Amino acid sequence: MKTTISGKLLNGRLAVLGAGKIGGILLRAFLEQKLVQPKRVHATVRHAEKARSLAKQLGIQASTDNRAAVHGADIILLAVKPQAVKEVLEEIKPEMKPGKLIVSVVASVSTQLMEKQLGMDLPVVRAMPNTPCAIGCGMTGLAKGIHAGKDHLEIARAKGRSAQAFGGCCHPRRGVFAGLLVWDESPKARW
């Protein structure tokens, strides 16, 4: 029997902005684990040819139009390159409405910076998966922004854990998250 959160995930609309490497891995895991129906997904990539290929391969809607992807979405998985975040957030800002949740897997961009860029009280959760997450064996640190509540954090955690895409999940207290990122981004520290 599905929990309320799992039901929300299955029945919600998901936009994946940046369905390349990590965004693509997570999207495939969500679809394989049936956490979201393909007809409820709109993923974006930079090139139209890649969008057509992705749509055909996964049975989802795919395009190069971030604003169109976000329009009907309940959950937005932000998986673009760090240098593209400002431009993408500016592009989708007109479509952002109360009730939407942003889950970001973008490295080096804090929830505070995203909230400031959006200029509205929207929940943002940062999920920082490490490399072994590509095979479901990693660890993901979660940090909620100022407007995100425990329910938003739980949605992000449930989505990742259920898909086994995030490996294990942890929600370190404020101040410890930065240390987790340093550890994750330093391969020598793990070995």
Where do the PLM segments sit?
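NAD(P)+-binding Rossmann beta1-loop-alpha1 motif at the extreme N-terminus of oxidoreductases
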Residues: 1-64, 68-71
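Internal alpha-helical scaffold of NAD(P)-dependent oxidoreductase catalytic cores
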Residues: 113-123, 139-173, 185-191
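Residue-level recognition of oxygen-bearing side chains
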Residues: 68, 176, 186
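Rossmann-like NAD(P)(H) cofactor-binding subdomain of soluble oxidoreductases
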Residues: 26, 48-49, 58, 66-71, ...
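Short coil/turn residues that cap or connect secondary-structure elements
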Residues: 18, 77-84, 184-187
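Mobile beta-alpha loop/short-helix "lid" or hinge segments that flank ligand
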Residues: 19, 122, 126-134, 164-178
